[in-house]
Regions:
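Short, acidic/small-residue loops that bind anionic groups at enzyme active sites
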Residues: 1-23, 163-166
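Short beta-strands and strand-loop turn motifs
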Residues: 19-22, 101-102, 131-135
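Solvent-exposed alpha-helices and their adjacent loops that cap or buttress functional pockets
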Residues: 10-11, 66-67, 74, 91-93, ...
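Short coil/turn connectors at secondary-structure junctions
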Residues: 14-16, 70, 95-96, 125-128, ...
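Oxyanion-binding "anion nests"
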Residues: 74-112
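C-terminal active-site/capping subdomain that shapes the small-molecule cofactor and substrate pocket
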Residues: 113-169
């Protein structure tokens, strides 16, 4: 099982907090980054409690797609897996929360379809805010940095603008 469905099942049925971060096998162990590794150790050891904020690295930038203020539990994961869980007992329930999603190796039309599927299924109902994570290697979009990520912004705005909630990417 991939992490997103496992996170959702643990949160919903066991009531436990789960941690999202770099994929252990692919990202964390292969290219270990001291700040990421330290943050993980601080969280699992209890040095960082619930609600603690970990500063983003200096090179990280957020784009405000819709301004506002929101509080709530952070829930989400890989967009393709969230869409695949639609209609199952493990489907995402982000009511009163801040929805986040990310993905890798997806094309813009597929991202649009997955967002539409989730929206039509009611997955965005009651969401207080949205955080768009990294979409690495967007198929059909040149580059892999901020310019490529910005190709998503019109799609994201289209799916969330009528909700009047803050959206960061």
């Amino acid at each position: 099982m991939r992490p997103s469905p496992l996170h959702l099942a643990i949160q919903r049925y066991a009531g436990f907090v789960t941690f999202h971060g770099p994929m252990l096998a692919q990202d964390l162990l292969a290219g270990r980054q001291a700040p990421t590794e330290q943050a993980l150790l601080d969280m699992v050891s209890g040095r960082l409690g619930a609600g603690s904020w970990i500063a983003a690295p200096p090179q990280a930038r957020l784009a405000t797609l819709a301004s506002g203020v929101a509080t709530g539990r952070l829930i989400g994961g890989n967009l393709a897996l969230l869409a695949a869980l639609t209609g199952t007992r493990y489907a995402i329930d982000a009511r009163d929360g801040i929805l986040f999603f990310e993905d890798v190796n997806e094309a813009l039309p597929r991202v649009d379809r997955m967002l539409a599927q989730l929206r039509r299924a009611g997955a965005f109902d009651g969401v207080r805010g949205v955080l768009v994570g990294s979409f690495t290697r967007l198929l059909g979009v040149p580059g892999d940095g901020e310019a490529a990520q910005a190709a998503l912004y019109p799609l994201v705005r289209e799916h969330f603008q009528a909700r009047g909630i803050p959206v960061l990417a």
